[in-house]
């Protein structure tokens, strides 16, 4: 008699029998689709197909690579500028507390419930790293790139500062194509007006979600302060997602990063809960400094400087 190994499928396995492994393909696809549709940096940046943790590819940076043809004369050509770059992926992990009742679900039902929560945790963490440089494993972020190129501006959201922010990009011979803002900036943007000869000019188009005619996305993060604004040429930002989404479920740990109503770390055993740890690999890089600029309110900039000087 030949014994066949049972195949792990969402239809025939209860979660208490499969506390670690790879998220079933159907739900991986849904999670990744959700992540890519909702991540602000993924909406704006260029996607790179990755089969491994690192990938080297060629990008076009400068120069038209074209020339005039004149019979009988020597032709002066303009060579395009290419660069070989390597994008590196890092493992991103999220931990979500779940009721032990969920372990009685079939795998399909469990991941159907958890899929949006996993995706949201992934894209929020990735955006904070790639845009703000918060807990950033990458060598790049919009914030870091702007600072490295000397393209930071301190001040309020005003008509003049928005234009100055864009000028930082065009002065580097790049073309801004999108802004990153946040919902709390909407009133500030509406008030960023210029009055000339009794005519009020505004750069903010709330109905179409644009600033100065450029697509604008709102990042939802407490780490991005009210009054902060990014603009850039996102043709020079790349991301990739190699590998699969893995998971582990445990109920014998204390979650130091998640607190209960009393402010204390969540103890899974005491509260009859489990923790779902999901991991994915994602890469991000910016291939050209001078493609992004960053507006920071003076109060926030002063607070950051004070914290740095005191070691807090």
Model regions and ranges:
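Protruding loop/beta-arch "assembly-hinge" segments enriched in small, turn-prone residues
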Residues: 1-29, 264-312
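Assembly/oligomerization interface modules of large self-assembling protein complexes
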Residues: 15-94, 158, 291
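Generic recognition of stable, solvent-exposed alpha-helical segments in well-folded globular domains
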Residues: 22, 26-30, 36, 109, ...
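Structured loops at beta-to-helix junctions and adjacent beta-edge loops in soluble globular domains
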Residues: 60-61, 99, 182-184, 279-281
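Alpha-helical scaffold segments that mediate packing/assembly in large oligomeric complexes
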Residues: 94-172, 294, 303-311
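Extended oligomerization regions of viral-like shell subunits
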Residues: 153-270, 274, 280, 308-312
